Amino acid sequence: MPAPTSRLRAPEELGKNAAASAPQINQNEDDVLIDSSAPLPEITTTSQDADTDMHVDEEGRPLFTPITATDGAYRIENRKVPVPPHRMSPLKAAWPKIYPPLVEHLKLQVRMNIKSKAVELRTSKNTTDTGALQKGEDFIKAFTLGFDVDDAIALLRLDDLYIETFEIKDVKPLNGEHLGRAIGRIAGKDGKTKFAIENASRTRVVLADQKIHILGGFRNIRIAREAIVSLILGSPPGKVYGNLRTVASRMKERF
């Protein structure tokens, strides 16, 4: 842009100066600018897929189609549950009832290793539940502790079930005949006391020598444990029955 104080020039002179200042194009250069005979690069037009189309509802909120399931990469995990020697024979006898829930419900791969006396669990590409392996391990452990198969299967169906284990000596150090009497008070004649505790607290109890295993919910386990502890400390069964009736009536009112 010329300065405001510069001398005015004629239009012809301005045209000559502009032509002189323009860069000269060498006609002999071999630069290829655009060749009409050369094939043009293919231009692909992408259309939106039906799965990625965005739809809007009446309130203006976007609605997206669900993602289709794909076969992604998965990691194989293994668990090895040891089986005590005295539970190998019951395991072999109940094996037709043990493996179907693990294979059909949890989609796990299961095998019984007789040589190492263990049950081996492994995930597969069909396993969808992330906690399937842990549930399967808890199920096998419950059976090895002495619970019935039908009771142990509840661990696969319900998430709020636990197993609590304690010994009689943890409550009171007993030896000899005193220990035998304590176990007898817990079991009762023909298992009557144990069944009464199970029915009142809605749990399952296993007496394995000096160890006691309780399967059930958190509050139910506490009720059964208090009754068993009272029997170990020497409370008469009649008093324990009365307390169980009171607790059972309260549970019915609550639920």
From Swiss-Prot:
It comes from Coccidioides immitis (strain RS) (Valley fever fungus). InterPro entries: KH-I_PNO1_first, KH_dom, KH_dom_type_1_sf, KH_PNO1_2nd. GO terms for cellular component: cytoplasm; nucleolus. SMART domains: KH. Belongs to the PNO1 family. Residues 176-228 form the KH domain. Component of the small ribosomal subunit, ribosomal RNA processing complex (SSU RRP complex). Keywords: Cytoplasm, Nucleus, Ribosome biogenesis, RNA-binding. Required for small ribosomal subunit (SSU) synthesis. Has a role in the processing of early nucleolar and late cytoplasmic pre-RNA species. One of its GO terms (biological process) is ribosome biogenesis. This is Pre-rRNA-processing protein PNO1. GO terms for molecular function: RNA binding. Residues 1-31 are annotated as: Disordered. The keyword Ion transport does not apply. Its main location: cytoplasm. It is found in: Cytoplasm; Nucleus, Nucleolus.
